[in-house]
Amino acid sequence: MSKPIVMERGVKYRDADKMALIPVKNVVTERDALLRKPEWMKIKLPADSTRIQGIKAAMRKNGLHSVCEEASCPNLAECFNHGTATFMILGAICTRRCPFCDVAHGRPVAPDAEEPQKLAQTIADMALRYVVITSVDRDDLRDGGAQHFADCITAIRAKSPEIKIETLVPDFRGRMDRALDILNATPPDVFNHNLENVPRIYRQVRPGADYNWSLKLLERFKEAHPEIPTKSGLMVGLGETNAEIIEVMRDLRRHGVTMLTLGQYLQPSRHHLPVQRYVSPEEFDEMKAEALAMGFTHAACGPFVRSSYHADLQAKGMEVK
């Protein structure tokens, strides 16, 4: 029997070390090894990376993190080249260990009390008009990190009064009442929390999370702020069916969610959950049509769509795919 991994505080555990801690193991089959990316999944990189390096330098200078880098997002080059990024607060170490996600797992250090001001100054320096703020899960904090979100929102608005802020929050497991009390006092312009996938395979995809808890979080925020858009997203290609995706969309509408994102799951490494199928652009178009018919005000559905991909355009109801 192998010895359990003893996690050191502040150390990032990734790939094999991270997956070794997950009770649901990833067994690679011959079929998984043969599954190749179709042509529509090919990305063309920009010829000039000057702006990309500039954003990375600004992040490093202020000790900030982007989910674009930490989660190995396939859209990083495009978004950075257009001068946009999704900021990840509360460090780069997550207390969860979801096998689809490339963010490091471990025992995080205490939150940086100066981060809200650093973040606000960086955003002001970049002259951003729309910003997405997300975080790792912080099950070690009594409020799950909600006060840190609120502090960041307050600091950003103080330096950039005209900015629109979208928060992509964790589930605040076991701390929903406390977290919502804090967030309701300093609400964002868009409230986002991702379901990620369908109930049947939730234990495999999001160990430690609960499908109905996440729906309740979205519903309760919407009840407190009916004027603020609520948003959620799923990754597809993990073994779910299109019919199951449609049913999740219905659940989201029943809980008051008004914006939807659907995108193709891509395996970050061989240690992560394998891609079970590639959903075609035509299927994404069909699911978008279903979403709009259900009453979503906007649905961004496409192979490269991610929750914060062109989030400013999504918020305006413009076409994103």
Swiss-Prot record:
Coiled coil as a keyword?
A: no
According to UniProt, the reaction catalysed is: [[Fe-S] cluster scaffold protein carrying a second [4Fe-4S](2+) cluster] + N(6)-octanoyl-L-lysyl-[protein] + 2 oxidized [2Fe-2S]-[ferredoxin] + 2 S-adenosyl-L-methionine + 4 H(+) = [[Fe-S] cluster scaffold protein] + N(6)-[(R)-dihydrolipoyl]-L-lysyl-[protein] + 4 Fe(3+) + 2 hydrogen sulfide + 2 5'-deoxyadenosine + 2 L-methionine + 2 reduced [2Fe-2S]-[ferredoxin]
Keyword field contains 4Fe-4S: yes
A Pfam family matched by this chain, by name?
Radical_SAM
Top class in the EC scheme: transferase
Cofactor(s) needed for function: [4Fe-4S] cluster
Q: In which pathway does it act?
A: Protein modification; protein lipoylation via endogenous pathway; protein N(6)-(lipoyl)lysine from octanoyl-[acyl-carrier-protein]: step 2/2
> What UniProt keywords are attached to this protein's entry?
4Fe-4S, Cytoplasm, Iron, Iron-sulfur, Metal-binding, S-adenosyl-L-methionine, Transferase
Example GO molecular function term? 4 iron, 4 sulfur cluster binding
| One GO CC term on file | cytoplasm
Q: List its EC numbers.
A: 2.8.1.8
Cite the binding residues for [4Fe-4S] cluster 1: C68, C73, C79, S308
The record's disulfide annotation reads: none
Which protein family is named in the record?
A: Belongs to the radical SAM superfamily. Lipoyl synthase family.
Protein's name in the database: Lipoyl synthase
Instruction: State the taxonomy lineage.
Output: Bacteria, Pseudomonadati, Pseudomonadota, Gammaproteobacteria, Enterobacterales
